[in-house]
From Swiss-Prot:
Protein name: Ion-translocating oxidoreductase complex subunit D
Residue list for modification FMN phosphoryl threonine: T185
GO term, biological process aspect, one: transmembrane transport
HAMAP family named among the record's database cross-references: RsxD_RnfD
Keyword Transmembrane helix set for record: yes
Alphabetical list of PANTHER family matching this protein: ELECTRON TRANSPORT COMPLEX PROTEIN RNFD, ION-TRANSLOCATING OXIDOREDUCTASE COMPLEX SUBUNIT D
Keyword Transcription: no
Gene of this entry: rnfD
InterPro entries hit by this protein: NqrB/RnfD, RnfD_bac
UniProt record similarity statement: Belongs to the NqrB/RnfD family.
One Pfam family recorded for the sequence: NQR2_RnfD_RnfE
Membrane topology: Multi-pass membrane protein
Listed transmembrane segments: 36-56, 77-99, 124-144, 212-232, 239-259, 265-285, 291-311, 315-335
Subunit structure: The complex is composed of six subunits: RnfA, RnfB, RnfC, RnfD, RnfE and RnfG.
Length: 349
């Protein structure tokens, strides 16, 4: 009788790419719902528009490459990229921005390098940086949270603003911020106030702040944190990168806060402001563009956390996760080279 000899590992989990992507998308939903609750229908509209563009671009590229369109769309990677771009940009950004960013992410960043599993940079963050550098005003003008806004646009108002239709007096007031609909994010506000000589305590006395965090942003981050914990429980991601990101940001912000509390925000503010939890659990954990070994993943995550703090406090862009992730993507091959696991029976290196 002939026996089949199989190499290790002998116990495996049959998790397909589409299954992992589905789990990530489902775990994103709590954060998306809370974000829509505080910042209106615009976020949902941007996400839906991004999904349409992403799937269309994915199908077009697959047709040109003579690959299976059904298989490519079925892995859900394009949809996940679209959702991440949609929740990252301001809710009322013009429609052509989300179209441009999503097309760039799918066609250039993803497929120019060979498609899924071959891209050097995170597609969603590369698209975000393209839009931020090209259109800084539109990318830094966020809608005021519903709890402090004088006016919150309805779904019809949001559609009119995004697609630039219905240019009557009311819509012009919304666009110009006369009704108090738009304002800077807490990170932007704090950075501007500190540059004007205000202390963190004086800056956080403004209505956009709720104690030690930003209004709305604390709950948005908490929702993404909850989704991230479920993602870990489902074993769709590993803990190393997320822990490294949060630990790196916490340690760096703690040092700054202890040395100068008047000019540096608390670690709690940094952890629950901007895209911290979204990036820590759903963006930095991209297995294609991150380091591969367990120790390398921790270093990779910690590098992102430290870079975020440095860019937030010293750079020109307050929410620095996109730049930090892309810089860490560049460093991933070096981390893998110098932090290789030792093969049993051989020396390290």
């Amino acid at each position: 009788m002939a026996f089949k000899i199989a190499s290790s590992p002998h116990v495996t989990r049959n998790l397909q790419t589409s299954t992992v992507m589905q789990r990530v998308i489902l775990c994103l939903l709590p954060g998306l719902v809370v974000q829509c609750a505080f910042f209106g229908w615009g976020t949902l509209i941007q996400v839906l528009l991004a999904i349409i563009v992403a799937l269309s671009c994915e199908a077009a590229v697959m047709k040109l490459r003579k690959r299976s369109i059904k298989a490519s769309l079925g892995d859900n990677s394009a949809m996940l990229t679209a959702i991440l771009i949609g929740v990252a940009i301001p809710p009322l950004a013009p429609w052509w921005m989300i179209v441009m960013g999503t097309a760039f992410a799918i066609v250039i960043v993803k497929h120019l390098y060979g498609g899924l599993g071959h891209n050097l940079f995170n597609p969603a963050m590369a698209a975000y940086v393209l839009l931020l550098v090209s259109f800084p005003l539109q990318m830094t003008t966020w809608i005021a949270p519903s709890t402090v806004a004088l006016n919150t646009p309805s779904i019809v108002d949001s559609l009119q603003l995004i697609f630039n239709v219905g240019a009557h007096v009311g819509m012009e007031q919304f666009r110009l911020g006369i009704d108090g609909i738009s304002m800077a994010t807490p990170l932007d506000t704090l950075k501007t106030d500190l540059s004007l000589g205000l202390t963190t305590t004086e800056s956080m006395a403004k209505s956009i702040f709720d104690g030690s965090t930003g209004v709305g942003w604390f709950w948005v981050n908490l929702a993404y944190l909850a989704g991230g914990i479920v993602l870990l429980k489902l074993k769709a991601i590993r803990w190393h990168i997320s822990t490294g990101v949060l630990a790196g940001l916490f340690v760096a912000s703690s040092v700054g806060f202890l040395l100068s509390p008047d000019t540096h925000a608390s670690p709690l503010f940094h952890l629950f402001s901007g895209a911290t939890m979204l990036a820590a659990f759903f963006i930095a954990t991209d297995p294609v563009t991150a380091a591969t070994s367990p120790r390398g993943r921790i270093i990779f995550g910690a590098l992102i956390g430290v870079l975020v703090y440095i860019i937030r406090t010293q750079g020109g862009y307050p929410d620095a996760f996109a730049f930090a992730v892309l810089l860490a993507n560049l460093c991933a091959p070096f981390i893998d080279y110098y932090v290789r696991p030792r093969t049993y029976g051989h020396s390290a290196g």
